């Protein structure tokens, strides 16, 4: 007997990341090869965007995916999020010429306040929300604060792209296969201030730090390379990283829904006060996932260098939060 379909809402659905994401969701890569899906796709109420969305839907139809039960187009979050089991908030206002970061925060605060309120009103009470649109941690915080009737733990931000980028760099440096590396962490904000931390990482069960015993490489090459990878891709491609971002979103939700089989993964989640991170801040932490829930990996040792890096990325998150505080009243 087939499972009941899961409703997946995706915002910014006609954008680059949306285009790289939707076909993989519809093929069963995110929720399982036996899980039917209904896609509820949101775009801005602009004629060009809605027309582009119709084109994407035509292509989805033309794939004849066995798991795709229905696809609908929306311009209003209140219809797009109706009964959603999963919501991928991909659409956000990109930084335009001459825009300061605080201007970007203000514009996105309006978008994510409206979307948080709509989720609060119409989504499933168990909805799993992943914010991909930048600044992802603070946008997730805004949506969470705008949805007081939903559990705070339902709101997450995407650090998985940083996690995957760090995995790839470590595999290259150690000469080992990426699949063998476990227990990597990316702490903090999805921004160049993030702290990728491989102190606990293993490769094929052995400590990775024994293979890469190089503090200068860690500080001067590894951390900046992971932090600035997005900018490097824009420089090379002329466009932002869309396929790798979509891939990370699939990884994040797949592990959240289907479980990580005991492996550590990085998710931006509301802090419970652990590791000196103030409660409620959406911060990248190591988690394991099972039965549709994530559990933070606790009581890891924090050395002086790590404390400094963790506090540095926290400072940025607190500044972002303070920048939008008045907009949440």
UniProtKB/Swiss-Prot annotation:
One of its GO terms (molecular function) is L-malate dehydrogenase (NAD+) activity. Substrate binds at residues 95, 101, 134, 165. It catalyses: (S)-malate + NAD(+) = oxaloacetate + NADH + H(+). NAD(+) binds at residues 12-18, 108, 115, 132-134. It holds the Pfam family Ldh_1_C. The active site is at residue 190. Gene3D superfamilies: Lactate dehydrogenase/glycoside hydrolase, family 4, C-terminal (3.90.110.10), NAD(P)-binding Rossmann-like Domain (3.40.50.720). HAMAP family: Malate_dehydrog_2. Belongs to the LDH/MDH superfamily. MDH type 2 family. Catalyzes the reversible oxidation of malate to oxaloacetate. This is Malate dehydrogenase. It comes from Bordetella avium (strain 197N).
């Amino acid at each position: 007997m087939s499972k009941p379909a899961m409703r997946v809402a995706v915002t910014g659905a006609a954008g680059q990341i949306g285009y790289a994401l939707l076909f993989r969701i519809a093929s069963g890569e995110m929720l399982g090869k036996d899980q039917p899906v209904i896609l509820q796709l949101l775009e801005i109420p602009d004629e060009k965007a809605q027309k582009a969305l119709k084109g994407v839907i035509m292509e989805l139809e033309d794939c004849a995916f066995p798991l795709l039960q229905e696809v609908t187009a929306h311009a209003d979050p209140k219809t797009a999020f109706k009964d959603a089991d999963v919501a991928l908030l991909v659409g956000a206002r990109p930084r335009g010429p001459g825009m300061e970061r605080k201007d970007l925060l203000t514009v996105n605060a309006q978008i994510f306040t409206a979307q948080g309120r709509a989720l609060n009103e119409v989504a499933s009470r168990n909805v799993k929300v992943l914010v991909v649109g930048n600044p992802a941690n603070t946008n997730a915080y805004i949506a969470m604060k705008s949805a007081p009737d939903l559990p705070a733990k339902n709101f997450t931000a995407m650090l998985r792209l940083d996690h995957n980028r760090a995995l790839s760099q470590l595999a290259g440096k150690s000469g080992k296969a990426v699949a063998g590396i476990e227990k990597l962490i990316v702490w903090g904000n999805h921004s160049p201030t993030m702290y990728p931390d491989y102190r606990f990482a293993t490769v094929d069960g052995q400590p990775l730090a024994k293979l890469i015993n190089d503090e200068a490489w860690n500080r001067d090459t590894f951390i900046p390379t992971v932090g600035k990878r997005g900018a490097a891709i824009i420089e090379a491609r002329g466009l932002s990283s869309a396929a790798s971002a979509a891939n990370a979103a699939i990884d994040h939700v797949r592990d959240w829904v289907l479980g990580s089989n005991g492996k550590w993964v990085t998710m931006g989640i509301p802090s419970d006060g652990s590791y000196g991170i103030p409660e409620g801040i959406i911060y990248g932490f190591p988690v394991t996932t099972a039965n549709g829930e994530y559990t933070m990996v606790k009581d890891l040792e924090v050395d002086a260098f790590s404390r400094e890096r963790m506090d540095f990325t926290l400072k940025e998150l607190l500044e972002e939060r303070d920048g939008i505080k008045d907009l949440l009243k």
